Design a protein with these regions (language model features):
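Single conserved hydrophobic/aromatic residue that forms the stacking wall/gate
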Residues: 1-10, 431-440
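Phosphate-binding site recognition
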Residues: 11-429
Length: 440
């Protein structure tokens, strides 16, 4: 694998856009930024972890990489830091739960998903008639996997919060999901002696009566500086791995190298997960931009945050606050169905990020992470708060820009007056700024 990777011409580099399986990525010669030294540190310094990151930030690939590592697949790590760090390459039984593959609109939908997962495991390790609940079956599976293999079990959970996110606004359904998942994950505590390692990932962290409230040994590394680079791409990693491509991309854009790097930073950098962390680039948008050699709102093209709009409307949130929101760590890190603020969901979903920190009062200053998110989110919101539909919205914005560039200020102000006449107060005075630097 390492030889194949070295032989690949840079111009033939295949970007792993949408590739979430580590084995496929390595065998098929996809480009990979080596995160395995951090993964090794993670595995060797603890046992139970939780990590929240925005969607399309590499969480599923992280889980898949951990799976390959605990399966002892040394050949997949040739040429990576892990090859030299790990000496034993022990194979462990792995229980992998992926909750990202289903729509959850009823208590039965979650129970059905968990049941299908358990059935798959029970075909490998057996079952007992007395295990008459999902949580008891999970406990039994962990116990038998340990006894039959002689190795403690690895638990990997991808997108643990998908059911909870889909139930935002439905208190009864969210409580049902919470109780089901809390009981299910409770097996991790009761079978602690049988477990080697557990990693749970998601977009959000739900507070109050959390699904993890019984797991007092679960380390939430979402705001730990030492693991900031575990998901996403840092500027240092870009220059180390993509320096030639940076110059090629700049040439295609007919820009100087320095001005191009600054534009790339403005569009896709800016995610801060602690008050003093380095900025991280959105990997999905960044790799798409390198593949196509053009700037675009790639993250927004993959899905729109409709649940966020419902939150904003239900809480009558004044969007003017969004570009300079302030909150504390307790609010920032927990979400529940009765919350009076949409900010935790917006932050944890990646539409806001940490811009500053007031150490005296423990207050975080939030804002849009970058230009892609700011422009995409505002453009996405316009149809929900005005009479324009999704098709009209981008064309109206283009008309604003063209009228300014051509000096047709009368048409511009007439259109602006009409726009705000159809706009609710919540968005009328919001941070709807035209990119004036691009107009002249």
């Amino acid at each position: 694998i390492a030889r194949r990777q070295r032989q690949m011409c840079i111009r033939d580099r295949i970007y792993p856009i949408g590739i979430q399986n580590f084995e496929s990525l390595r065998l098929d010669g996809y480009f990979y930024i080596d995160k395995t030294a951090l993964i090794y540190q993670l595995v060797k310094s603890g046992r139970y972890y939780f990590l929240s990151r925005p969607r399309r930030f590499g969480k599923s690939l992280l889980i898949s990489t951990l799976e390959a590592y605990f399966q002892g697949k040394k050949e997949l790590f040739q040429g990576l830091a892990m090859e030299k760090l790990e000496k034993d390459w022990t194979k462990y039984p792995i229980l992998h739960i992926d909750l990202n593959t289903q729509k959850y609109d009823s208590p039965q939908s979650l129970e059905s998903k968990l049941n299908r997962t358990l059935v798959t495991w029970e075909k490998l390790y057996g079952s007992e008639p007395a295990e008459d609940s999902l949580s008891m079956r999970f406990e039994g599976t962990i116990q038998r996997a340990y006894e039959q293999t002689g190795q403690r079990v690895v638990i990997l959970v991808d997108e643990y919060d998908k059911p909870m996110l889909q139930a935002i606004g439905n208190k009864e359904l969210q409580n049902s999901f919470r109780e089901t998942l809390k009981a299910f994950y409770g097996a991790l505590k009761s079978k602690d002696g049988c477990i080697k390692f557990a990693m749970l990932t998601g977009v959000t962290k739900f507070g109050k009566v959390s699904v993890f409230s019984d797991l007092n040994n679960l380390d939430d590394i979402s705001m730990w500086n030492e693991y900031i680079e575990l998901c996403g791409i840092s500027e240092k990693e870009i220059h180390k791995n993509l320096e030639t491509e940076l110059h090629e991309f700049a040439d295609v854009q007919k820009m100087t190298y320095d001005s191009f790097c600054e534009k790339l930073r403005q569009y896709y950098d800016g995610y801060h997960f602690t008050h003093n962390s380095i900025g991280m680039y959105n990997p999905f948008s960044l790799l798409n931009a390198f593949k196509r050699k053009e700037f675009g709102s790639y993250w927004f093209e993959t899905g729109t945050p409709t649940y966020l709009v419902e939150l904003l409307k239900r809480h009558h949130y004044n969007l003017e606050r969004m570009a300079h929101e302030e909150t504390n760590a307790q609010v920032l890190n927990s979400i529940d169905s009765e919350s009076t603020s949409p900010i935790p969901v917006i932050y944890q979903s990646g539409y806001l990020t940490i811009k500053g920190y007031d150490e005296e009062f423990g207050i975080y200053h939030l804002g849009f992470p970058n230009k892609e998110v700011e422009e995409g989110f505002i453009q996405f919101l316009v149809p929900y708060y005005t009479s324009m539909n999704n098709v009209e919205s981008p064309f109206e914005i283009q008309k604003f820009v063209r009228e300014i560039r051509s000096g047709d200020y009368n048409s511009f102000f007439q259109r602006l007056q009409s726009f705000f006449a159809d706009t609710t107060y919540a968005v009328s005075y919001a941070h709807l700024t035209l990119p004036t630097s691009d107009l002249v």
